[in-house]
Amino acid sequence: MLHFNRCHHLKKITQKCFSSIHVKTDKHAQRFLSRTFALAELRKSWYSTHSLVGDKNIILMGPPGAGKTTVGRIIGQKLGCCVIDVDDDILEKTWNMSVSEKLQDVGNEQFLEEEGKAVLNFSASGSVISLTGSNPMHDASMWHLKKNGIIVYLDVPLLDLICRLKLMKTDRIVGQNSGTSMKDLLKFRRQYYKKWYDARVFCESGASPEEVADKVLNAIKRYQDVDSETFISTRHVWPEDCEQKVSAKFFSEAVIEGLASDGGLFVPAKEFPKLSCGEWKSLVGATYVERAQILLERCIHPADIPAARLGEMIETAYGENFACSKIAPVRHLSGNQFILELFHGPTGSFKDLSLQLMPHIFAHCIPPSCNYMILVATSGDTGSAVLNGFSRLNKNDKQRIAVVAFFPENGVSDFQKAQIIGSQRENGWAVGVESDFDFCQTAIKRIFNDSDFTGFLTVEYGTILSSANSINWGRLLPQVVYHASAYLDLVSQGFISFGSPVDVCIPTGNFGNILAAVYAKMMGIPIRKFICASNQNHVLTDFIKTGHYDLRERKLAQTFSPSIDILKSSNLERHLHLMANKDGQLMTELFNRLESQHHFQIEKALVEKLQQDFVADWCSEGECLAAINSTYNTSGYILDPHTAVAKVVADRVQDKTCPVIISSTAHYSKFAPAIMQALKIKEINETSSSQLYLLGSYNALPPLHEALLERTKQQEKMEYQVCAADMNVLKSHVEQLVQNQFI
């Protein structure tokens, strides 16, 4: 009786499922598919087709050998819904011949058309559909499927695919001609898979079909749950009678708004997503672009940016505008020290790694009915990187997004000033401020929080203000990628095995770069210590050592490393919020005290927690120049002053028991006078371009930055505005630029 009831129930499920599947062919107006629907075991599960995807189909896409058919059957069993294999249930039943026979009969091009036609005549609902490897190469049929389905891409490492296909004795697939290797064809097909998917399942080497099936279901749940990934302010307080959703923002809102209305910074309401060891290992052989796509997809919900669109943005951002194909390569310097070269972008600093991508993210997130004015404070590198990044938007986006970069008139190097000024375009301007970076940064925060002024701009000019500094989550997030990528490169180059710890040493001013490394660790990269390297403006070093953030009696010094000439470190608030278990009340108290009393002290328990992961020290001007000189003499490599600061600190505090990755945050050519002084080259009072040519004659590593050289030829005579260090003057400048751009 039990066996009968069980079989009877299976029969009813089968009939119910397949009653909604129809295939129309030239020979038959309509016919029902019949296929054995067998379950190894009936078990109760909260999964159901209705509760998970409703009437939509789960569509599994991927190359031959990805396991679509096997995984599809497992998912069908878990959900209690019908499973359709396009090869077996659609194509062969339509053609009355095997797929291989059809391919041999009509050839590659005609096969794709015939395959697409068969899929166009097919419809289903509430089913699991396993596509062929070539389905995504036919646009019309994929649009047809996408209308009523969630497409999940089974992304399997290339070497795994080739091994599987050999075991399956598959020696030819659609599109493979004589002289075309299986490896090349599989690489070629990736562009089609990336075009269509809604969710990606990254299938690490050795994953079982059951594990992949669970990943598919989790990916679909995430895709469906559009409210699951939100952001809160670091100063958000959680009252007992208030639900989380009251003040939570989505990713797109956090990017658009930049700064929270209470003065805090946006952070994820939940923990950072974490990759498994197997997933990380599968990324060892991946390119920078591929790594970025995997990591950022985990951090950005597809409801904010569809995965396929995000992939397009990443490919655009890290394309031909980077001088090195590896984007952010790692170079062995000496001993246990490695240099992470973050200066191969168009403006020669690490800011390019985020600011070539962030403008595309911002343009996607904003509503089409408003204009946006981006306000940026720069201590040197951010200004030119922001102006360059937003100038690369398409024409329509540039008409509704403009940028103003405020920089300390006498607080950046001559080359940096020329570069910022020379980066001005039709939608971007540079404004020198007769003060320091801290004033510029504080002024922008105050402008954002001036509701009368921002409201006036919105009503009068239809313009909303936002930020592209690292206070903006969309600016900070892409930086996580290069810290993870650096570790994977060390594994790829054979210096370490995955799981071995490393230290990172980062020249730090605003705390964004080193915070991105913290997030990389949260995602699964085994970073042991974060070494914070300061110059003479060592407020962060003092804080990490004592827990006392004290700006009293402290004046900003101008150094050879101007990008870290910062006293108020904005992103420190994000890290303290993380350490304090998201205590928004504490953050409000601490940073209000910093604003009013110019100092704060954290409790002993937090100091100890901070010091478990962080080590800090600082470098004098003389030590900085000496490090540039000695490194060049011993290795032929020229460090920029910021990297030299990190090198000095790493030499002093790192115990040499594991590798240390030193972030090289800028190309040395941006600081030619300091480099010439360090190398004891007689300084000639010539143009920046002449100084670069002189340094280039030394044939040092890294080579001369060609993009910087080209820009210096054009930018030294451009005009720009200078304003007094007065809030009302800055607001007047902003309003005038809004009028000029949008009215």
UniProtKB/Swiss-Prot annotation:
Claim: Coiled coil is one of the keywords in the record: no
N6-acetyllysine found at: K281
A Pfam family matched in the record: SKI
InterPro entries: P-loop_NTPase, Shikimate/glucono_kinase, Shikimate_kinase/TSH1, Thr_synth_N, Thr_synth_N_sf, Thr_synthase-like, TrpB-like_PALP_sf
Modified residues (N6-(pyridoxal phosphate)lysine): K351
Cellular component per GO, a single term: cytoplasm
Cofactor(s) demanded: pyridoxal 5'-phosphate
Keywords: Acetylation, Pyridoxal phosphate
SUPFAM superfamilies, per the entry: P-loop containing nucleoside triphosphate hydrolases, Tryptophan synthase beta subunit-like PLP-dependent enzymes
PANTHER family associated with the record: THREONINE SYNTHASE-LIKE 1
NCBIfam families in the cross-refs: thrC (TIGR00260)
Family according to the record: Belongs to the threonine synthase family.
The protein's name: Threonine synthase-like 1
Organism of provenance: Homo sapiens
Gene (UniProt): THNSL1
